[in-house]
Amino acid sequence: MKVAFAGTGYINKIHARAARNCGLELVAVVNHHAESMAQFAADFSIPRQYKTVEAMLADGNVDALVVSTPNYLHAPQTIAALEAGVHVMVEKPMSMNAAEAEQMCEAAEKSGSTLMVAHCWRFDPEVRWLKEHSGKLGKIIRTKGYGVHKHWGPSGWFTHSEFAGGGAMADMGIHALDTVRFLLDDPQPVSVYARIGTYYKGFDVDDTGLIIVNWENGVTSYIESGWWQPHSDGAEAATQLYGTQGFGQIFPTKLELPNATEEKIEIIN
């Protein structure tokens, strides 16, 4: 499979290493910053460089595209690739808003190509360990999730609504939301309460957020997001499951069962 990359930042470097380790052929990179694009191409022995996704698609010979660019580019770059018959993995958040996300899904359905959002935590070994063992907790009643940076936050386009669409909730809270959906077998929401605010920096996006979701299976999820927070009740990407027979969590990952013993995670190398 021939893979191209839109964006040359930290996350796409991880994706490129993973693709190379899987034996995929890295054929093209897209970025309007020539210097960083040239360095990315050199680091991963990528032969083709382009300023736009459209120019790359016009030359063809690409099977899949990894989109890891500022959020406002996710929808147009993804839709262009799907319409060209190219599979797409797009970084989170999927888009700037729900309308764009629906357009992306429609393009995937019409083209027959695969569209995937890169929600990475559901593939983490510790998350999968907790899902595998969550049956020991009985009926899950509620969950708590945290997508919080303490004493730190991003800069650049992340903090501008015209480029990012949202702030800490779209950047960090979305990890906690997708993780709990995975642990609960991807239920549909019945009701959602959400509140965001900006308190710590002069951004025009949120640096603090809260979501409460009532799911169709009767579980209630509480999710916090934040940048520059002075404190968090959980680790940066922690998720906690409260069941009738016990408690489980990731980061640190463990089960606490009714007999007061703890079953800690197996060592995963």
Annotate the PLM regions.
Residues M1-F44:
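N-terminal Rossmann-like dinucleotide-binding module
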Residues D178-K254:
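Contiguous beta-strand/loop segments that form the cofactor/metal-binding neighborhood of enzyme cores
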Residues F5, Y50, V67, V90, ...:
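Hydrophobic residues in well-ordered beta-strands that form the structural core
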Residues E106-T114, R128-I141, Y242-G243:
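Basic phosphate/pyrophosphate-binding loop/patch that engages nucleotide-derived ligands
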Residues W121-F203:
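Predominantly a Rossmann-like dinucleotide-binding segment in NAD(P)-dependent oxidoreductases
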